[in-house]
């Protein structure tokens, strides 16, 4: 089963390339609804659309009908539609797919179940690879989903009659993706060299604002994150300052390109890694829990994470002005509800922010959305034990604020790190490596997600509690580490 948007991805054609020489019996159903998450883009989408809508192609039905009637008479009329449909399927668009060794059938109505069964049974009897092209309507069966297919691609709880979300979240608080998108638009309005790039995720990454107001500075490359990275590198070579907005989990696809085409070349590309950390409603595949581990070893890379949406705006501005390969990671969903400045400000590269001083017992270095949890844990420990735990908003994974970290290692007997990322190879590992290299004797406690794939969940709080990442569990880990240090 292949979605039509998958035809914008190179891996699909790598598989197609093997069909003629390796496969005798194979059925590929091309589910063509002209959508991935958003509207499809590119040459393949254009080609499929022309196959379906070209008036010359569609006239084949009526022309074949007239031909059969004239040749065989009225009794043959009942067979006309079948003959015309088969002729259309076998003749018109077949050349494209037959180059890959497929016999092409279709397009047919994917919602006509008897017709679909008839074609599938025919495909089963074939001794050669077949591609069956079916046309469907994204969201069919639910009017609200048909009206807004992009919104319902990954739906939160909603009213089945109106289609409106039943979430109780504060609508006055912007999503991180929207805060990023609006900031990018503001920056791009002042500088035509600032451009936004998405891999078929304009709405999901917040680039819909740029698409609407500055379409000439917006580029959708289709579901092809690796191409998005190389495309950004090419634009950077020509003096542009590209911002590529990609989900953290999909950055894995673009890793090689980010390494060789961006970081090795020291090109000024900013990658905005949306859905970094937990993304519970999107399922196990969408948790962004590995990006620090695979990006941290890249020379020339700058990696950061904001504690709130206002800091995200500052980081985006800092990155596009830095002239360096930068990666900003931030979570799914609502921001912290802080007041955002009218205009973003630059942040000093590699500098953390002390939010709470310690009494020389322990300091928590928290990254991004875990800063709030660290503050809660520190306050709870002080209330319970009378011990004042320090808290630092780390901001940067790379370059790490080494100067501040070493000072705090001399002052405290314990350094704790907390991150919305796997513990292995993440921010905590960077802190531990720095302290070990400097021969510091303080204890280190790394709090992050365990070495396993985190499953789908209904909400962040439930998954955090399940895997030892809730505020209470962080507090208990710190207390235990204090006793052992």
Put a short name on every predicted segment.
Residues 1-9, 32, 97, 243:
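DG-centered beta-turn motif at the end of beta-strands
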Residues 21-151, 167-183, 189-212, 226-230, ...:
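Thiamine diphosphate
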Residues 215-220:
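Short pre-catalytic strand/loop immediately N-terminal to key active-site residues, enriched for Gly-Thr
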Residues 157-161, 296-341:
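Helix-enriched interaction subdomains in cytosolic or periplasmic regions
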Residues 231, 242-245, 255-257:
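Catalytic phosphate/nucleotide-handling subdomain of diverse soluble enzymes
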Residues 6-19:
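Acidic/histidine-rich catalytic neighborhood of metal-dependent amide-processing enzymes
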């Amino acid at each position: 089963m292949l979605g039509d948007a998958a035809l914008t991805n190179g891996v699909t054609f790598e598989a197609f390339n093997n069909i003629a020489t390796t496969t005798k019996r194979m059925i590929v159903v091309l589910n063509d609804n002209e959508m991935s998450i958003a509207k499809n883009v590119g040459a393949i989408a254009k080609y499929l659309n022309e196959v379906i809508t070209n008036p010359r192609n569609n006239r084949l039905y009526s022309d074949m009908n007239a031909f059969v009637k004239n040749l065989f008479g009225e009794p043959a009329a009942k067979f006309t539609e079948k003959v015309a449909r088969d002729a259309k399927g076998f003749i018109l668009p077949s050349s494209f797919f037959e180059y890959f060794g497929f016999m092409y059938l279709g397009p047919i109505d994917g919602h006509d179940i008897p017709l679909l069964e008839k074609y599938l049974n025919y495909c089963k009897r074939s001794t050669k690879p077949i591609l069956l092209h079916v046309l469907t309507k994204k969201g069919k069966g639910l009017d609200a989903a048909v009206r807004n297919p992009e919104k319902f691609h990954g739906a939160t709880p909603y009213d089945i009659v109106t289609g409106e979300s039943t979430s109780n979240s504060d609508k006055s608080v912007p999503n991180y993706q929207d805060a990023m998108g609006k900031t990018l638009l503001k920056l791009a309005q002042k500088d035509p060299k600032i451009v936004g790039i998405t891999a078929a995720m304009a709405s999901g990454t917040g680039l819909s604002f740029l698409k609407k107001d500055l379409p000439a500075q917006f580029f959708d490359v289709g579901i092809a994150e690796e191409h998005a990275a190389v495309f950004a590198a090419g634009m950077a070579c020509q003096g542009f300052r590209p911002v590529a907005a990609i989900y953290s989990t999909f950055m894995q696809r673009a890793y090689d390109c980010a390494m060789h085409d961006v970081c090795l070349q020291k090109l000024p590309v900013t990658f905005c890694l949306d859905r970094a950390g937990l993304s519970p409603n999107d399922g196990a595949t969408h948790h962004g829990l590995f990006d620090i581990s695979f990006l941290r070893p890249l020379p020339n890379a700058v990696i950061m994470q904001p504690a709130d949406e206002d800091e995200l705006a500052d980081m985006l501005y800092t990155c596009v002005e830095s002239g360096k390969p930068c990666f900003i990671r931030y979570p799914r969903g609502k921001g912290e509800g802080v007041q955002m400045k009218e205009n973003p400000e630059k942040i000093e590269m590699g500098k953390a922010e002390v939010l709470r001083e310690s009494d020389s017992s322990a300091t928590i270095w928290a990254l991004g959305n875990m800063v709030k949890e660290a503050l809660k844990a520190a306050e709870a420990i002080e209330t319970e034990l009378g011990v004042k735990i320090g808290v630092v908003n780390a901001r940067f994974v790379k370059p790490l604020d080494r100067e501040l970290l070493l000072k705090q290692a001399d002052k405290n007997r314990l350094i704790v790190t907390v991150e919305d990322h796997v513990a292995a190879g993440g921010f905590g590992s960077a802190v531990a490596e720095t302290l070990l290299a400097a021969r510091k004797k303080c204890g280190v406690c790394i709090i992050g997600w365990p070495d396993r794939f985190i499953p789908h969940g209904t909400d962040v709080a439930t998954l955090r509690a399940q895997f030892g990442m809730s505020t209470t569990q962080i507090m208990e880990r710190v207390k235990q580490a204090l006793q052992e240090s």
